[in-house]
């Protein structure tokens, strides 16, 4: 496994491979990340992973400085998983002095995480576009847990004619339903016990949908009701949106819907989602 820190180093190492799978991460890896690596390993003869805590996707009052980092542990996990190349650039390597070009999707900034975290998806789209240009992957793997990110990346690839196939991998969960996240490490014991309420709220609404409910506001109310039963949970938003446009729905049609939410437990903010398949899909 080669560990590379500059664009020039990576491009030189990349030249040894024809087909390459790629998993972009911010490090502090968990089984959700490793599930992406495992799928990449199954589908591609070589796999690259990036570790870069991207400052441009964090807001001024967010957790960039304290975002968990453990590079040695990450490298041991990636070596054991059979990764070929690891790209760990510095902030200066990715954003040199005078950097001034960004990828912006105005529609993404108006809904869900984009509305709650101004500028977040400008940072996400820009860094992913840069990584695609540096890594030149055949396929790139993303988790369904960050549902809006997958929509943003897919649209960017389509709009900018980027020659990479995007593969979405199902969310990996703890036995009690909590979606794996690097931010789960922030939860104290009481908050950790309360956190599966996100999964329960989503599952309850999904069960109502499976039983025939198609009114979106009814499903929002179902999710809010479950969340209200957990005193530590403070919802940021609860959404029933079109799975491609992420616009809020009045009624769920043939395309199905994305159930999603962001919930705070004191200073810890967790997100989760559940994709409702459309009729006949």
From Swiss-Prot:
Record bears the keyword Nucleotidyltransferase: no
**What subcellular compartments does it reside in?**
Cytoplasm
One GO-annotated biological process of the protein: pantothenate biosynthetic process
Catalytic site positions:
33
Q: What is its EC number?
A: 6.3.2.1
Q: Where does ATP bind?
A: 26-33, 143-146, 172, 180-183
For this UniProt record, the keywords arranged alphabetically read as follows: ATP-binding, Cytoplasm, Ligase, Nucleotide-binding, Pantothenate biosynthesis
Q: Which domain of life is it from?
A: Bacteria
Identify the residues that bind beta-alanine: 57
Entry-linked Pfam families? Pantoate_ligase
Gene Ontology CC: one annotated term: cytosol
Q: What GO molecular functions are on record for this protein? A: ATP binding; pantoate-beta-alanine ligase activity
Swiss-Prot/TrEMBL catalytic activity? (R)-pantoate + beta-alanine + ATP = (R)-pantothenate + AMP + diphosphate + H(+)
Sequence positions that bind (R)-pantoate: 57, 149
Query: Pathway of this protein?
Result: Cofactor biosynthesis; (R)-pantothenate biosynthesis; (R)-pantothenate from (R)-pantoate and beta-alanine: step 1/1
Chain segments annotated as transmembrane = none
Q: How does it assemble?
A: Homodimer.
Query: What further note is attached to this protein's record?
Result: The reaction proceeds by a bi uni uni bi ping pong mechanism.
Family of this protein: Belongs to the pantothenate synthetase family.
The job of this chain, per UniProt, is described as: Catalyzes the condensation of pantoate with beta-alanine in an ATP-dependent reaction via a pantoyl-adenylate intermediate.
> What protein name applies here?
Pantothenate synthetase
